[in-house]
């Protein structure tokens, strides 16, 4: 359609609007943004080499706008409608996460951009969990939860109308896009009034706190919004100075010269006043703040090594002990870009330097990039990990549901049921990273 707005522009508008809304709802989130911005600035000022690398890799511009949100929905219909909503913003479901292995009765995916240009512009992602009613053991309670969920609609009538219009027209003009952002935002807004009485809330809460959070409110309120930092250890140590109490452990890999995957921490969930049906006042605890530090994406071989080491490491009682033990355990994981490339542990994006451009005819498909890197013709840039770690996600969920101890089991994965609810298969993160690396090699003449 003429004068249509791009998905990237809509995603940018939406992520900015959501950030502004969450800042109003959870003032500590604003404090967190300031702290992260200060730490990032200090890191870049003290490390000109990192600054230059991030500029060259198109990573710097996205740093200050980078966020991920997390939501939880109750029905297949809600999940499928969210898929249509996020598609308008150029966000697609990547990976399947089974959180039942940590005793959390949900399974999840991450809606995010998938092409290089969209990620460089604004890599906004939303970790989206679907409640698994079949994991509620009490049959009466399970039926009650299903009945409550059947009666709600988390989307405004106008939002549903706009979804139809977009799918019929194949796009939005500027006015429609702005209206869509405002209507979509309502789905994620916090509602103080619960849809159930206190007795029902307590019964669901006693079964699992997360079930009460999903079932008892009129929307799928955003339960955290996460900025990206370049030094999560520094942020963790400074949070108490800003009046923010961090969770005990930083989740994920240890601090390294070459960061890998994802490290996360958070502040404790807020106790918020709610009104139950019948105007009875009570409290609900679900929403919190989170910070993340992202590193290089790992190949299946690298991920296997990471998972094995993390399993062997276990968890410490406090963050200092935990991090020291992690560092000791992870000594066997190479900590240089060269070794990680050489051993096929991580994904990289290859670019020709001006000198490489001048010698393009001397570069052939199948050439080993390493001699070309040493000659100064090619640079290899780590591809940022854009996804999530199930164990870390579960750790964050548990600590903010009042439980710092991490219980892990084999879980009860049901990817097929999740994809059926979603209405499409989830994308394979490894395939996306491999394609990104191969695209870059092709541009250099290496493939």
Curated annotation (Swiss-Prot):
<comment type="function">
    <text>Catalyzes the decarboxylation and hydroxylation of 2-oxoadipate (2OA) to form D-2-hydroxyglutarate (D-2-HGA).</text>
</comment>
<feature type="binding site">
    <location>
        <position position="72"/>
    </location>
    <ligand>
        <name>2-oxoadipate</name>
    </ligand>
</feature>
<keyword id="KW-0479">Metal-binding</keyword>
<keyword id="KW-0408">Iron</keyword>
<protein>
    <recommendedName>
        <fullName>2-oxoadipate dioxygenase/decarboxylase</fullName>
        <ecNumber>1.13.11.93</ecNumber>
    </recommendedName>
</protein>
<feature type="binding site">
    <location>
        <position position="68"/>
    </location>
    <ligand>
        <name>Fe(2+)</name>
    </ligand>
</feature>
<keyword id="KW-0223">Dioxygenase</keyword>
<feature type="binding site">
    <location>
        <position position="224"/>
    </location>
    <ligand>
        <name>Fe(2+)</name>
    </ligand>
</feature>
<dbReference type="GO" id="GO:0051213">
    <property type="term" value="F:dioxygenase activity"/>
</dbReference>
<dbReference type="InterPro" id="IPR009770">
    <property type="entry name" value="HGLS"/>
</dbReference>
<dbReference type="Pfam" id="PF07063">
    <property type="entry name" value="HGLS"/>
</dbReference>
<dbReference type="GO" id="GO:0046872">
    <property type="term" value="F:metal ion binding"/>
</dbReference>
<comment type="similarity">
    <text>Belongs to the 2-oxoadipate dioxygenase/decarboxylase family.</text>
</comment>
<feature type="binding site">
    <location>
        <position position="224"/>
    </location>
    <ligand>
        <name>2-oxoadipate</name>
    </ligand>
</feature>
<keyword id="KW-0560">Oxidoreductase</keyword>
<feature type="binding site">
    <location>
        <position position="68"/>
    </location>
    <ligand>
        <name>2-oxoadipate</name>
    </ligand>
</feature>
<feature type="binding site">
    <location>
        <position position="290"/>
    </location>
    <ligand>
        <name>Fe(2+)</name>
    </ligand>
</feature>
<dbReference type="InterPro" id="IPR047869">
    <property type="entry name" value="YdcJ_bac-like"/>
</dbReference>
<feature type="binding site">
    <location>
        <position position="391"/>
    </location>
    <ligand>
        <name>2-oxoadipate</name>
    </ligand>
</feature>
<feature type="site" description="Important for substrate specificity">
    <location>
        <position position="72"/>
    </location>
</feature>
């Amino acid at each position: 359609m003429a004068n249509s707005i791009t998905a990237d522009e809509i995603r940018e508008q939406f992520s900015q609007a959501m950030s502004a809304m969450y800042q109003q709802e959870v003032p500590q989130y604003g404090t967190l943004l300031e702290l992260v911005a200060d730490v990032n600035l200090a890191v870049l000022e003290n490390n000109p080499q990192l600054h230059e690398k991030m500029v060259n890799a198109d990573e710097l511009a996205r740093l200050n706008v980078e966020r991920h949100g997390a939501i939880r929905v109750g029905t297949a219909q809600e999940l499928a409608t969210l898929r249509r909503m996020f598609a308008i913003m150029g966000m697609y479901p990547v990976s399947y996460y089974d959180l039942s292995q940590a005793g959390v009765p949900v399974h999840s995916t991450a809606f995010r951009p998938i092409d290089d240009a969209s990620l460089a512009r604004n890599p906004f992602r939303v970790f989206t969990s679907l409640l698994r009613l079949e994991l509620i053991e009490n049959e009466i309670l399970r039926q009650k939860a299903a009945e409550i969920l059947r009666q709600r609609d988390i989307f405004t009538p106008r939002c549903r109308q706009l979804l139809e219009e977009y799918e019929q027209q194949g796009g939005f003009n500027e006015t429609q896009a702005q209206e869509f952002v405002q209507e979509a935002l309502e789905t994620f807004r916090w509602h103080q009034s619960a849809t159930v009485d206190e007795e029902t809330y307590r019964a669901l809460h006693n079964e699992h706190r997360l079930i009460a959070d999903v079932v008892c409110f009129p929307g799928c309120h955003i339960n955290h919004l996460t900025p990206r930092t370049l030094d999560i250890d520094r942020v963790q140590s400074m949070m108490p100075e800003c009046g923010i109490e961090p969770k005990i452990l930083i989740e994920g890999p240890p601090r390294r010269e070459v960061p890998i995957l994802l490290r996360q921490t958070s502040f404790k969930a807020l106790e918020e006043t709610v009104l139950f049906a019948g105007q009875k006042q009570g409290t609900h605890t679900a929403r919190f703040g989170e910070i993340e530090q992202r590193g290089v994406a790992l190949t299946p071989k690298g991920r296997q090594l990471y998972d094995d080491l993390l399993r062997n490491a276990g968890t410490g009682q406090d963050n200092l002990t935990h991090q020291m033990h992690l560092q000791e355990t992870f000594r066997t994981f190479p900590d240089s870009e060269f070794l990680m490339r050489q051993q096929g542990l991580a994904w990289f994006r290859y670019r020709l330097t001006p000198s490489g451009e001048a010698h393009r005819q001397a570069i052939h498909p199948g050439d080993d990039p390493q001699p070309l890197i040493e000659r100064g013709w090619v640079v290899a840039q780590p591809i940022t990990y854009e996804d999530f770690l199930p164990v870390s996600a579960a750790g964050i969920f548990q600590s903010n549901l009042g439980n710092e101890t991490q219980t892990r089991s084999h879980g009860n994965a049901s990817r097929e049921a999740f994809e059926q609810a979603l209405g499409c298969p989830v994308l394979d993160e490894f395939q996306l990273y491999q394609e990104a690396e191969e695209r870059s090699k092709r541009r250099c003449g290496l493939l």
